[in-house]
Amino acid sequence: MPFLPAFRRVAALTLVALPACLFPTLSAAKPASETGAFIHPINNAEDAPLVELGSNGLLRYALYSERGSDHARNMVPDFSRAGYQGGGVSLPTRSSIPVIEVLEPNAEGDDYPRIQAAIDAVAVRVQDSRGLRGAVLLRRGRYRLSKTLTIRASGVVLRGEGRGADGTVIRSEVSDRQGRILEVGSSESAVPRAALDPRRTAINMDYVPVGAMLITVKSAAGYRVGDTVSIAREPNARWVGPEGIDTARYRWTPSDYAVYSERVVTAVDHDTITLDAPIMDAIATRFGGGSVYRTDPIRISQVGIEDLRLEGNPETGTVNGTTDSGPFTALRLGAIYNSWVRDVTVRYVSHGFVTRNGAQFNTLQDIAYLDPRYGETQGARRYVFLYEGNAAFNLIQRCYNQGGRHTFVIGARVPGPNVFLDCLAVGDSNDSGPHHRWSTGTLYDNTKGYMLRAQNRRYSGTGHGWAGAQQMFWNTEHDIYVVQAPPFAMNWSVGQVGAIAPGKFPPEEPAGIVQSMGQMVTPRSLYLQQLRDRLGEQAVINVTTEAQRDGRIWDSLAAGVGE
């Protein structure tokens, strides 16, 4: 492959003794003009770390070069817009949401009709100033479902009285292939819906770096502050070919890998627009460039799922080849924003909590996955906390897994940013990380488990290729790591505890940027510090527990599961 693995050295790059071919040649790089696209403080000190706290208590960012370049022109992006209402906003208190429908458990029979009817009754009520309609409360006890519960309207909250075995337990008898216990939202195209007047315009920059928040376009006429826009990265044959990331041999095509990232315009200056959140994947003219257009998505919002235990069929087998005798997925979110899942435990399923297209600005917290079913080591089984589709700006925090395969996992072409914060996996049998096909902009912040890998998966599956780029492992503790650098992109690991290893598929790929290996860094949480920098200490208090602010909470996560 005709590129040079030359990266800018940023801080003390700690590597273990592996074959020399696994690691890049590091050299000082020249600053690039693209640095004008950033709004965050730049640390120009020689060998500066990727991210560090400055003397003023705010983060400073060193620029780095992507694989194949010697130009330090990219920045670790700000992930802090992830979560409900764009991060830093408390979820609505339970007491502030009126209970409209109350159901008691039945001794026997199918509870689906009456629960769905209660949801539908709340769905037609008038929304309040917050966009909320009210809650359906399922009293403590056991409920049975013959079909998938669905929430299709904004402002509906489905609430129980606890996620433990003595709380509100919903047992699903759905047995359709890929069946779900609870479906929230709906399907949506991976291409964001264009506005009536989209004002599509080409990006007028040779290179839009990772971390950029300003983009110059051919014409910004008609763009206004507050517009929702899609940044389209439109690769060409060169990008998937030998001069690029060399994945055409895995049956990747340019049209399949156009990726759309939604942002909000915060300023317009001539033909330069400022965005509310940074770019997660560089856009280069030589690899196809990109465009911008105004969007008008149709999604629901202000939906809450809380204080429940969702269960599949405990009789479903656990060995490879198990047939679909119970629901496959517990909960799936799509075409939904500014919503939440809190204090929910799932049990006896394959997949736990899953997003799909259109899931944005959602928080899933204090959630757990127990006693999985379906194939113990079989492919496409036991994905626990899964970002799929064009999901972006989602936060999963304080999550716990026991027995899954892929715990903190990303599907194909997920644009990000998305965050896992303060999460623990126990007994996971395979790796966490991006699973396939160029997902970008994921932060694994204080996760703990078995393996955490960002690598070229080559022909695995149906041609997984490069699984992910711009994946940040921050103060994580896993037994084994793989941190490879994709061509013309990068992956990072800072403060990791655990052994680094060559990739499973092509071990010869050069490593990404690894700093402070074996020694955790300050700040403890990148997400929370970025949030603090952007919105202040109260924003951090709004979205965390006191124990979380004091330090690591892994040891306490299992206690809240409600076994």
Task: Locate predicted features.
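Extracellular "leader-to-stem" segments immediately downstream of a signal peptide or signal-anchor
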Residues: 18-319, 492-563
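A short, hydrophobic/aromatic-rich structural module that often spans a beta strand
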Residues: 275-299, 322-337, 353-370, 418-422, ...
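Extracellular beta-strand solenoid repeats
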Residues: 137, 144, 150, 159, ...
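Bacterial N-terminal signal peptides that target proteins for export
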Residues: 2-14
